[in-house]
Regions:
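N-terminal binding-site loop/beta-alpha segment at the start of enzyme catalytic domains
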Residues: 1-82
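Conserved, mostly hydrophobic/aromatic
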Residues: 6, 18, 50, 58, ...
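Structural preference for beta-strand elements that scaffold enzyme active sites
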Residues: 13-17, 56-57, 63, 81-85, ...
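Short glycine-enriched, charge-decorated loop/helix-capping segments at active-site entrances
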Residues: 29-37, 97-103, 221-224
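Short, acidic/polar
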Residues: 34-50, 103-120, 162-170
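Acidic (Asp/Glu)-rich catalytic clusters
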Residues: 72-83, 116-120, 150, 172-175, ...
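Active-site groove signature of glycoside hydrolases
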Residues: 116-135
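Beta/alpha (TIM)-barrel catalytic core signal, keyed to glycine-rich beta->alpha loops juxtaposed to Asp/Glu
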Residues: 132-305, 316-318
Length: 318
């Protein structure tokens, strides 16, 4: 599988990144409990198959249930062959405020140490802040402790996971960060306006939510009534699917990979068939300028409604 540089980090990542949330906890449309998930042994087997197929980039987090533990077991003997990314646990209190600076530093350090232990490694390649909102991004104590931990060799690249274009712009303007994981897909293309700036500043981009938690796949049918307009809009991609001779998941993935500024596309994988589908998209053939323009015109007319965290809170994705 072709690899791309992650900004100016010097880290080479596969075009497809294995999203590890589904192997660690119930997640996604149609996955309501542990009985819908792979066993630990099957999950490890799937990770090994992904690695043997050319994927070297694996994404996990403290909050993803058993995901870190499973990846630690899967790659203990191949640690130097894979790029591991994990995320700090949530920093905000239940009231939406940040703890004091001293407590923040302790939380960040403890989260990283716990991840290293669970992943059975003495470093990770990428350590990210999860759901980095304005309060978090403006806090100098967080940047300070992360810089200290990076200097100690506990991770190679300092990153953030953002949701909004305002958050992504703050990250790019700050000059502190090596990479950003952000949402970008056929339905909601707003973050694409910042790709050129990220490339100019040497910040690597990892795109997530390309399949919108399964909506842009065979799971995106018979949705909650609140998502009826979204379901109807998905049908509008049929002409582009026929023109490209692709299935919707492949089109969605190729769309993101067609932007040279994107280092890797994060795909949630919990079944061999979804791995195989992802692998078929990385054939070196991307959407040309004309097809990208058509895809742009087919973006959802109210992109602010494409809000997975909100949909989750409303239980629209069960």
């Amino acid at each position: 599988m072709k690899k791309r540089l992650l900004g100016n980090t010097g880290i080479e990542v596969s075009e497809i990144a294995f999203g590890g949330v589904e192997i660690g906890m119930p997640y996604g449309i149609g996955v309501s409990s542990e009985k819908d998930m792979l066993s630990e042994s099957k999950a490890i087997e799937l990770l090994h198959t992904a690695f043997d197929s050319g994927i070297n980039f694996f994404d996990t987090a403290r909050m993803y249930g058993e995901s870190e533990k499973i990846m630690g077991k899967a790659f203990k003997a191949r640690r130097d062959k894979v790029v591991l990314a994990t995320k700090c646990r949530h920093l905000l209190n239940s009231d939406g405020n940040l703890p004091n600076d001293s407590m923040l530093k302790t939380i960040v350090k403890d989260s990283l140490y716990e991840s290293l232990k669970t992943l059975q490694t003495d470093y990770v390649d990428i350590f990210m802040l999860h759901q980095a909102n304005q309060r978090i991004l403006e806090n100098e104590a967080i940047v300070c402790v992360l810089s200290e931990l990076k200097e100690r060799g506990l991770f190679r690249a300092m990153g953030v996971s953002t949701y909004t274009t305002d958050e992504t712009k703050m990250v790019l303007d700050s000059g502190h960060w090596n990479m950003i994981q952000l949402p970008f897909n056929l339905m909601d293309q707003r973050q694409g306006d910042l790709f050129e700036d990220a490339h100019h500043k040497g910040v690597g981009l990892v795109v997530r939510s390309v399949l919108l938690k399964g909506l842009l796949s065979d799971r995106g049918k018979n949705l909650h009534p609140a998502l009826k307009d979204v379901e109807n809009h998905i049908a509008k991609y049929q002409s582009l699917l026929e023109e490209t001779n692709l299935k919707l998941p492949a089109l969605a993935t190729k769309f993101a990979l067609s932007f040279s500024e994107v280092s890797s596309v994060l795909v949630g994988i919990d079944k061999r068939k979804y791995l195989d589908e992802a692998l078929k998209t990385v054939d070196g053939i991307y959407l040309d300028k004309e097809k990208l323009e058509k895809a742009n015109q087919l973006a959802y007319p109210e992109p602010e409604f494409i809000n997975l965290p909100y949909w989750d809170r409303m239980n629209w994705l069960k």
